[in-house]
Amino acid sequence: MKKYLLGIGLILALIACKQNVSSLDEKNSVSVDLPGEMKVLVSKEKNKDGKYDLIATVDKLELKGTSDKNNGSGVLEGVKADKSKVKLTISDDLGQTTLEVFKEDGKTLVSKKVTSKDKSSTEEKFNEKGEVSEKIITRADGTRLEYTGIKSDGSGKAKEVLKGYVLEGTLTAEKTTLVVKEGTVTLSKNISKSGEVSVELNDTDSSAATKKTAAWNSGTSTLTITVNSKKTKDLVFTKENTITVQQYDSNGTKLEGSAVEITKLDEIKNALK
């Protein structure tokens, strides 16, 4: 009888050792919130290898992994029905997640999304050569830059989605240029690779009395428009990714009234008239 009980005990012990992350539930694990509105389950106890088991579900796919830490950080992996491989990397401080999808070989990237705690993210899609073909940069405030048709030289189409309207333009290896046209006037917003913004205005009007010129002040992020040597209005491109417009008095010497936030593309065009 004693040998029988010992045998049963040994079998149960072996079963326990073979248990993996698929057995995690609310009783034996802790749920940890992650950037990107994801969650990871972390085992309360270490497994037979002395590590904590991790489990997460992304787009209905279960990802599994282990970690030396019990805070939720680590690397989890899974395989889709089409045999493509998914890898989720959670930073040590839980402030960032990196979700990567690879082809069946596990090396060729298909897509990649890095999400931070402040809700900002960068999402990339790759072509057959492993080069970035599409990219979306989402800021913490929800505004975003979208790039499509990216070529090997870094050029492509660009779009900035702001609150209430969209600016469109082009991407080069050096910068993003977003353009708004109204009559003879072209307003260009340039964003460097480092994120620095500069704005310029070009007017093809041949009449000196109505031709618009503009000066950019990088310190205040303000474009001051002038007509016939008189300042007419200020366009301010704020750090909050909004644009405001404020008029000058008839003499062009001082601002009057209050700055008004632009919420429609037509309002930018009206400011260029």
From Swiss-Prot:
Q: Its topology with respect to the membrane?
A: Lipid-anchor
Say where the protein is mainly found: membrane
Q: What is the effect of changing residue 144 to K?
A: In strain: 21343WI
GO CC entries:
cell outer membrane; cell surface; membrane
Residues linked to a lipid group, S-diacylglycerol cysteine type? 17
N-palmitoyl cysteine lipid sites: 17
Q: Which SUPFAM superfamilies match?
A: Outer surface protein
Which keywords belong to this entry?
Answer: Cell outer membrane, Lipoprotein, Membrane, Palmitate, Plasmid, Signal
InterPro entries tied to this protein = OM_lipoprot_Borrelia (IPR001809), OM_lipoprot_dom_sf (IPR023322)
Q: Give start-end of the signal peptide.
A: 1-16
Protein's recorded name = Outer surface protein A
Q: Which gene encodes it?
A: ospA
